[in-house]
Amino acid sequence: DGGEAKRLIVEKLVELGIPFIDVGLGVELDNESLGGILRITTSTVENREHLRSKDRISFSVENGNDDYSKNIQIADLNALNAALAVIKWKKLFGFYRDLEKENFCAYTIDGNSLINDDQL
């Protein structure tokens, strides 16, 4: 989901000092198989600069040109994205140890890689 409504929600959360996590999923079809990236972006009072400086959250309106927008629903990828977001949320509140304190994480499907960035 994108667009102006999402921008307003994010701006209000930032204004009120509320931490939040935004997730995204992009997939593409290539040679009869899907590839793509899952994204988990965390915003806290201590670290919000990466939201603007690195455009970590998309506010674009979906144009329907990517394969995910064409109603490809991949339950396992949606579940993984949600699980990674919940794990990060629990790290924020001390339930899990957080050595890297990353505020951005990307999972690439084809390489099975987790990449962390935007550490405190």
Regions inferred by a protein language model and the residue ranges of each:
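E1/E1-like adenylate-forming module used to activate ubiquitin-like modifiers
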Residues: 1-80, 110-111, 115-120
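Oxidoreductase and adenylate-handling cofactor-binding alpha/beta cores
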Residues: 11, 83-97
